[in-house]
Design a protein with these regions (language model features):
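Anion-binding (especially nucleotide phosphate/pyrophosphate-binding) glycine-rich loop
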Residues: 1-91, 255, 261, 265-266
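C-terminal nucleotide
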Residues: 1-24, 35, 42, 119-274, ...
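Acidic, glycine-rich active-site loops and adjacent beta-strand->loop/helix elements
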Residues: 2, 50-56, 89-99, 124, ...
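Internal, well-ordered alpha-helical segments in soluble enzyme and binding-protein domains
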Residues: 28, 50, 66, 88-91, ...
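Fold-level recognition of mixed alpha/beta catalytic cores in primary-metabolism enzymes, strongest
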Residues: 58-146, 323-324
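A generic "binding-loop/recognition-motif" signal
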Residues: 116, 280, 315
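N-terminal pre-core extensions flanking Radical SAM catalytic domains
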Residues: 278-285
Length: 325
């Protein structure tokens, strides 16, 4: 069949085999399988017919959702459901780190596995705690819309990796390894002593302020307060984190064009928008009043094409077996 993939278990068991001759999808399957074996669990053969409505390369965790599907199938068929959400997520992370050579964390995998809006805390080094909570957009008359502005033509690897590296450098100047090991006030008290990279200072300030905004949203049921935090987060990403365009391709700013046009179309009380995903290219997220959705979609479609403007919702279910629901 067209699109059929097949992963040989014997190759998975060979730890020297990195599946370099196979497709990205096959490498993910192999990576998840090997991670499961490394954790001491079982794998086996199965046939699966897979369809998806997750948009690829759009900041909505398409690879992580596929990894969690494969991990969930293996967990149910061969391990009696004994693998935890964290273990399934780590299997997906391993697949990307080792078989894709991509420095993925656990955020996307946990979000897909848990379902709903998910609060995550990575303060304990090497671990994550998480809980699901509600974002009351639909019940308050708002719709989420993703606008895919295009991939861009720059290699984004250096742009992505520079963000944590610069934050690590500031943390080191403050005498610790990570920014969460110290405080915003300690950073502000010593800001004149940290020299050589002003962008790193701005990104550090974003880190501390963003964590405060996350805590506010998690604890709030006030839709206006939640929207305000999203709007402030978007401005901070644009101004402080600076992940809305690529330094080496400054003439290509589709993200900032989409944000600027959205703000024009939305007005002062029609909703909010921000860069989505890793940034630098790709997708923005808009949360729009239902009464303005059709007009907003039409206007953004005229610029970015209708196929790139999608109404979305947050699925309340994570990694589940349908018959158990």
């Amino acid at each position: 069949h067209k699109g059929t993939i097949c992963v040989d278990t014997q190759r998975v068991l060979n730890t020297q085999d990195s599946f370099d001759d196979r497709s990205n999808t096959e490498r993910l399957v192999a990576g998840v399988c090997r991670a499961v074996i490394n954790m001491g669990y079982n794998i086996g053969g199965f046939d699966a017919y897979v369809t998806s409505e997750v948009v690829p390369s759009a900041g909505v965790s398409s690879s992580a959702s596929f990894e969690m599907l494969i991990g969930g199938i293996i967990n149910d068929l061969f391990n009696n459901g004994s693998m935890t959400i964290k273990e399934c997520a780590r299997a997906g992370q391993y697949a990307e780190n080792v078989f894709w050579n991509k420095s993925s964390g656990l955020m996307d995998q946990i979000a897909c596995a848990v379902g709903g809006a998910v609060y995550m805390d990575f303060k304990t080094d090497g671990d994550v705690t998480f809980e699901s909570f509600d974002l009351p957009f639909r019940s308050n008359g708002y719709t989420m819309i993703l606008i895919n502005t295009g991939k861009g033509h720059a290699d984004l690897s250096a742009e992505y990796s520079a963000i944590p590296l610069e934050m690590y450098s500031v943390a080191q100047s403050l005498g610790c390894r990570r920014l969460c090991d110290t405080t915003k006030q300690e950073f502000l008290n010593n800001i004149t002593e940290i020299k050589g990279n002003d962008r790193a200072l701005l990104r550090t300030l974003h880190f501390y302020n963003e964590n405060e905004r996350v805590e506010c949203v998690r604890k709030s049921n006030d839709i206006e307060q939640i929207l305000s935090m999203i709007e402030k987060s978007g401005h901070s990403s644009w101004e402080l984190l600076q992940n809305c365009w690529c330094e080496g391709a400054y003439k290509e700013q589709r993200i900032t064009v989409a944000l600027a046009l959205s703000n024009e179309f939305i007005g002062h009380d029609g909703g909010v928008c921000r860069v989505h995903g890793g940034g630098f290219a790709g997708v923005i997220l808009a949360v729009i009043k239902d009464s303005l959705v059709s007009s907003y979609v039409d206007k953004m479609s005229a610029v970015f094409d209708r196929s790139n403007v999608r109404r979305i919702d947050i699925r309340p279910y994570g990694l589940v077996k349908v018959k158990d629901m």
